[in-house]
Amino acid sequence: RVVAPSKLAGNALVVQETLDQVLSIRKAWRFNRGERRVRRLPMLAYDSLQPDTSGMATADVVDMYNGAPDRYQWALLGKREMLMPYNSYALHQKGIPYTDILQEKHVNPALLRHELHRVWVVEATLRTGFSHPYAKRRFYIDEDSWQILAVDLYNKNGELSGLQEAHSINYYDVPMFMSTLETIYDLKGGRYFVDGLDNNEPMYDFNVQLKKSDFTAAALRREGI
């Protein structure tokens, strides 16, 4: 559920994932606060746009990459040491005003931390016959956690047009290594989108008990009322 900004607050989404998204695509429903109704989304995968992102984020950039891998040709380019976003505890601090985090062209660099880490470099090239804003993607995957830390995004002309970063921390009490904030930059348009701002929100409840019925259109409808 979207909690901010106010013009989007109340919109919500529920997704049912499948184990093999090549054979069976995910199902998704969206509650629109303005219409006060739930609609089935015909497609929330590949290059379809995420709702409420002003066209900044395709469906498959959530969690740095998600969904079926079949539209790309994949290649392992090897391992290298690179400066990567890591241990982003300053960015995760409670009570920081979001206006201090989000600057005009980028996230406030004073709150970011980058460290030298060994990463696996994986390149994905769009297969012939398919379309996507990102004709090539280069993933930098943490050797220790297997978290995707950064992604270079190239357009059909081979130009670097975008960048994703996962600013991650250890949730020691779980335990789990996960991003506290994900960013995607449109280098051509001079815009960026962030996902995961929680400095002024309640902390995740990793022990919540969920039921299958919580992930249905009916549950989404009840949530939106």
Where in this protein do the model-derived segments appear?
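Mature hydrolase/peptidase catalytic cores and their serpin-fold inhibitory cores, especially
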Residues: 69-135, 217-225
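Gly/Pro-enriched, hydrophobic low-complexity segments
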Residues: 1-7, 13-69, 107, 113-210
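Compact functional segments
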Residues: 202-225
